[in-house]
Amino acid sequence: MHSVYQHWDPLKVCAVGRSFPPEFYSRIKNSKVRNAMERVAIETEEDYQKIISKLEEFNVEIVRTDISENVDDYCNDQGIVVAPPPMCPRDFTAMVGNKFYMPGGNYAKNFDVNEIVDKLLFKIAQKKFSNVSDPLVCKLAQKIEDILEPNHGLSPKSSLLKFQSRVTDKFKTFLYKDQEYPFWQVKHIVDFTELKELIIQAKCQTIYSNIKFPNNKHFYAFKSIEEWLNKNNVPIVYDEYINSATMTRVGKDLYFGNVNLIDGLNQDSLKVKWQKLFPNYRINTCNGIGGHVDGHFCPVVPGLILTLRDPKMFEETFPDWEVVSMPDEGWKKVEGFTKMKNKVRGKWWIAGEEDNDDLIDYIETWLHDWVSYVEETVFDVNMLVIDEKNVMCNGYNKVVFDTFDRYGITPHVINFRHRYFWDGGLHCNTSDISRFGDMKDFFPERD
């Protein structure tokens, strides 16, 4: 029987991601950009193989995500690659107990974001004071007021009261620039795109762009994983948006982070969902931690946490555990690169951008300067724990390695050179499917 209860139990079976091969970049006309991306592709697969080789030293069985050989499976009608490669299986999967949660055919289809927005608008139209207790309604009202009255400086709750004061009781119209408009026209005046993006991200428990590889209907990246699960009689739960990048498994306790603002606002309703999915667990929320929790902290073994955050954040959730903080590590050390990256994100795929000087400078700077800098100076808490005595990490940090030595832990350095180029560390690039061990209760006083 296959299961995962603690992510420091001995690893048996592990999924490993996969990126595009160098041939996928043959359409890029500018040789500087094409050659650079081909190099990134080659080195990325080399580093995946290093991960695999290290895991196989510990007799871990490997299952990889799948890549189509046809680049058109990742392109839109204009021939631009819009679907990213399945590099980070953990961002979309999780083994919780003996069930594996993963994307299926209804990924991002089993909810209607427009219907969600319509229901929120309907609640606003009712003008009930009780709406102030619905944080998502308040956030929607604030978004509307941002358009109707820029720079209003109102809080979400105050925005709700302000907008509801615009709405007439009898005819359900609202005042805008001294004119009355039918209430439904608010959908034509206000652009809800950004809000909808946040709602989708919160629903799918993902971060950044909603263009993720599970959305690719031309090719299913989890076919090999699905076949392995079926062959080994592992129950599969599709499209519940549970993953072990936003959730940490510590025996009977599950810890969930907030993906974004909307996720934080909906924390109570999400907690109800999690309690229904996991009735035999205690559900904990990591307040103050947004995005993927595995990029902020790692419970390495019982009693020890490594984090980029303030140790005080863990006093209630992990009482009496040692918390080793490294506030200046991780993304903070590559802020210069991330500014460049945000400026040219994804443009190497776009026809006409091949001669973009910013793009060329970005790629060349990454390959010539940042790759070696990251290898030598940046430590990442996005680590893969093989067992209680062996941890896979991206580099050296004296404080961390001294701590490991006190706990009898051997660090295995696997430098995933393009981790910050692809936004995926060693933990994200893998997903533990099976570990030895049964559920333990590290905080029995909570019952």
PLM features: what roles do these ranges have?
Residues 1-447:
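The feature marks the mature, well-folded catalytic cores of soluble enzymes
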